[in-house]
């Protein structure tokens, strides 16, 4: 198994380096004028036409990597002794490369890996622009030798606008990789979609800036040569300028509404505007043409596979078992799941409640452990914003069921919670919730006597005393004393806006639990193609892409080639790229639907078993469940393990945690893992402390859902 993984990894590295090499060389004079004519003899066939070269050099390698990564990630889930040793070395390398290098706005927390790859990518963009400008100014402008200085200046100005657009195209080759939620590419470098959204934002800013400059330059150029109406031209056999104009208008709308100041104040406008990305892609592809579209096809193809599979999953109604209403007015929702659904700590689940919004989906942190809780999955929801406020109102009313759809779970492909000697978990407000799943996973691992558990220090800061109810969720309700006896947990809780414990507690502030009746259309959350089924996802990717190549080859050979004869100047320019997009969508639809339905049929037995289990519960809704320990309310005898939370917790009023003191006083551990989730200021403060070099045993990791 280890040899096969090494072989697959080596093959992926070779393919990726070759793919990057093509991107490096494609802007050079050697590639344009020497290599391209030679390659065209072999790759510009009657079956693929002018787009054949880009398909072979830039599309096939990355699609092949996506398939191989499914095999690699599948074997990673099969543990062995050699693999555990390999993982140890891998974590050490990731620790060094994940060290914080800088903390600054607007980039945020930048690790060594991020800084290295960002600088390399910027170098690639500068290299491409300089090469393209050299080609334009010193090679292509020889036709203007006899022209006056004004014509040469105009030609150079136009060339700059054209080439800056090419640089933006480079960004589009990577733009959709970070937002592919069930990506098989991101886990290869230890990333998740949620943690990679900032790369999508960076790429979006750079590409939109390049395209805006490209558009403005051409508008000025056409005004100078009295051809301003070219802005609205739609050439049948050449670049349709109007398509580019429409794409730019959509792009600016998406760009402006995604700026942090706009997005946070008017999230719904941002949300709905961002869903214009489909039109943006269509008009952009029409503008650049089929050959250039094939250069960026892999990340778009993989994104749409993921998007369609997510759509298929979201058509199912998920079985909501119960809802806890915390004294802090926050919620914990518990869903039924099949026992075959596995996920890692710090994972997230997307929720959709049609009675609140027909279109909106929102991500929430999973607090349960798939190893400890085989048949249920829980998420915590903070009441913040109009959507969560409406959900809270719904659940507070006298309802016996709620229609909910889910997507996910999504999270790290692997998460070894016991890899450090000690763990310091720093959370602010609802930022504590990802650490609940970490602690529950440690409880599960404590059942294995051979596992050495780290000492855990949970440092949490809350605005008000009633927010301490978050800590009631650390242990599952059915946990026993023996299950937590090996866990060395210490909690330091800070109440920043109150100087002492409230003397009284309002009745409506008690922790309440509501149970919901099962509905015929509800089903447990089951594994989706991705983290739980990498091989099947690989089958979807491979079959849909092979089908796409066959269909595009047939259409080109028997429909386009008889008209165009590979000249690229006779058959309609727009129709050519529409064929590529249409056939790609058809292949994704057919392949994904067949595999999804096949897997759904196989999962039916598991669904039936889970339904029997949840239906065996007597669904009565108590007015309130046992209250929170931190509100002095008595619990039932079987809830005695919760006393250990109180015993392990020190509550500090009227102050914030001294994070520098806490981190530097980490006792007697060579390897201290520091995880932080909360407000940006808190994350940045912890990152600066860990990167200061004063404590080399601190290994930093940030969990952020505020992008």
From Swiss-Prot:
Chief place of localization: membrane
GO MF annotation terms: ferric-chelate reductase (NADH) activity; ferric-chelate reductase activity; metal ion binding
Keywords: Cell membrane, Electron transport, FAD, Flavoprotein, Heme, Ion transport, Iron, Membrane, Metal-binding, NAD, Oxidoreductase, Transmembrane, Transmembrane helix, Transport
Native organism taxonomy: Eukaryota, Viridiplantae, Streptophyta, Embryophyta, Tracheophyta
Positions of FAD binding: 362-365
Positions bound to NAD(+): 408-411
Catalysis performed (reactions): 2 a Fe(II)-siderophore + NAD(+) + H(+) = 2 a Fe(III)-siderophore + NADH
Tissues expressing the protein: Expressed at low levels in roots, shoots, pedicels and inflorescence stems, flowers, sepals, stigmas and anther filaments.
All ranges on the Cytoplasmic side of the membrane: 1-9, 74-106, 223-272, 341-533, 599-707
Domain FAD-binding FR-type: 313-416
Induction: Up-regulated in roots and shoots by iron deficiency and copper deficiency. Induced by copper deficiency in a SPL7-dependent manner.
Cofactors, names only: FAD
Cleavable signal peptide: none
Function according to Swiss-Prot or TrEMBL: Ferric chelate reductase probably involved in iron reduction in shoots. May participate in the transport of electrons to a Fe(3+) ion via FAD and heme intermediates. May act in iron metabolism in reproductive organs. May function as root surface cupric chelate reductase and participate in the reduction of Cu(2+), for Cu(+) acquisition via Cu(+) transporters in response to copper deficiency.
Protein's name according to its UniProt entry: Ferric reduction oxidase 5
Swiss-Prot/TrEMBL GO biological process terms: monoatomic ion transport
Compartments in which it is found: Cell membrane
EC main group: oxidoreductase
Ferric oxidoreductase domain mapped to chain residues: 165-284
Annotated Gene Ontology cellular component terms: plasma membrane
Record membrane topology: Multi-pass membrane protein
Region (Disordered): 608-630
Composition bias, Polar residues: 613-627
Ranges annotated as spanning the membrane: 10-29, 55-73, 107-130, 199-222, 273-297, 320-340, 534-556, 577-598
Residues on Extracellular side: 30-54, 131-198, 298-319, 557-576
Family classification: Belongs to the ferric reductase (FRE) family.
Chain positions recorded as heme binding sites: 200, 214, 274, 287
């Amino acid at each position: 198994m280890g040899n096969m993984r090494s072989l697959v990894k080596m093959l992926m590295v070779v393919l990726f380096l070759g793919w990057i090499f093509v991107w490096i060389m494609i802007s050079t004079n050697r590639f344009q004028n020497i290599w391209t004519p030679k390659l065209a003899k072999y790759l510009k066939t009657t079956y693929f036409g002018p787009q054949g070269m880009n398909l072979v050099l830039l599309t096939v390698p990355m699609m092949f990597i996506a398939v191989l990564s499914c095999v690699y990630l599948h074997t990673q889930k099969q543990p062995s002794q050699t693999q555990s040793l390999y993982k140890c070395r891998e974590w050490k390398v990731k620790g060094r490369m994940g060290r914080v290098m800088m903390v600054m706005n607007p980039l945020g927390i930048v690790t060594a890996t991020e800084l290295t790859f960002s600088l390399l990518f910027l170098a690639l963009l500068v290299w491409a622009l300089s090469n393209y400008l050299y080609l334009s100014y010193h090679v292509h402008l020889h036709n203007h030798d006899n022209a006056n200085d004004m014509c040469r200046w105009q030609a150079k100005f136009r060339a700059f606008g054209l080439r800056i657009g090419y640089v933006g195209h480079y960004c589009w080759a990577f733009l959709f990789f970070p937002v592919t939620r069930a990506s098989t590419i991101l886990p290869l470098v230890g990333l998740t979609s949620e943690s990679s959204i900032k790369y999508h934002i960076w790429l979006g800013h750079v590409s939109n800036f390049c395209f805006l400059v490209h558009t403005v330059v051409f508008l000025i150029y056409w005004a100078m040569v009295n051809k301003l109406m070219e802005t609205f031209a739609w050439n049948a056999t050449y670049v349709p300028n109007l398509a580019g104009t429409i794409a730019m208008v959509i792009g600016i709308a998406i760009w402006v509404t995604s700026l942090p100041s706009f997005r946070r104040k008017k999230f719904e406008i941002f949300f709905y505007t961002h869903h214009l990305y489909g039109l943006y892609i269509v008009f952009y592809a029409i503008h650049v043409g089929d050959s250039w579209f094939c250069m960026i096809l892999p990340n778009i193809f993989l994104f749409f596979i993921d998007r369609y599979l997510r759509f298929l999953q979201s058509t199912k109604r998920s079985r909501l078992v119960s809802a806890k209403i915390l004294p802090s007015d926050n919620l914990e929702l518990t869903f039924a799941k099949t026992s075959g659904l596995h996920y890692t700590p710090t994972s997230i689940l997307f929720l959709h409640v049609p009675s609140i919004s027909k279109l909106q989906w929102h991500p929430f942190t999973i607090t349960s452990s798939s190893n400890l809780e085989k048949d249920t999955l829980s998420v915590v929801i903070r009441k913040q914003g109009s959507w969560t406020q409406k959900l809270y109102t719904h659940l507070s009313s006298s309802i016996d069921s709620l229609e909910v759809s889910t997507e996910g779970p999504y999270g790290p492909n692997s998460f070894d919670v016991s890899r450090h000697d000690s763990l310091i978990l720093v959370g602010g407000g609802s930022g504590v919730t990802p650490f609940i799943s970490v602690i529950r996973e440690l409880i599960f691992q404590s059942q294995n006597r051979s596992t050495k558990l780290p000492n855990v220090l949970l440092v949490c800061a809350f605005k008000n005393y009633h927010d301490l109810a978050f800590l009631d969720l650390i242990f599952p309700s059915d946990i026993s004393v023996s299950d937590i006896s090996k866990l060395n947990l210490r909690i330091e809780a800070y109440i920043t806006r109150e100087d002492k414990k409230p003397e009284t507690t309002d009745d409506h502030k008690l922790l309440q639990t509501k149970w919901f009746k099962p509905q015929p259309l509800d089903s447990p959350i089951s594994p989706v193609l991705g983290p739980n089924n990498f091989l099947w996802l690989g089958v979807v990717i491979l079959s849909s892409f092979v089908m796409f190549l066959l269909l595009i080859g047939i259409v080109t050979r028997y429909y386009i080639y008889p008209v165009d004869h590979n000249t690229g100047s006779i058959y309609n320019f727009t129709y050519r790229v529409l064929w590529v997009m249409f056939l790609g969508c058809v292949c994704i639809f057919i392949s994904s639907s067949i595999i999804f339905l096949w897997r759904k049929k196989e999962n039916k037995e598991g669904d039936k078993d889970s339904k029997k289990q949840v239906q065996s519960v007597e669904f009565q809704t108590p007015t309130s469940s046992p209250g929170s320990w931190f509100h002095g309310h008595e619990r039932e005898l079987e809830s005695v393990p919760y006393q250990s939370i109180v015993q392990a917790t020190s509550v500090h009023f009227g102050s914030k945690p001294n994070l520098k003191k806490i981190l530097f006083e980490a006792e007697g551990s060579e390897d201290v893992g520091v995880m932080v989730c909360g407000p940006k200021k808190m994350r940045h403060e912890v990152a600066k402390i860990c990167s200061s070099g004063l404590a080399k045993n601190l290994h930093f990791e940030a969990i952020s859902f505020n992008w």
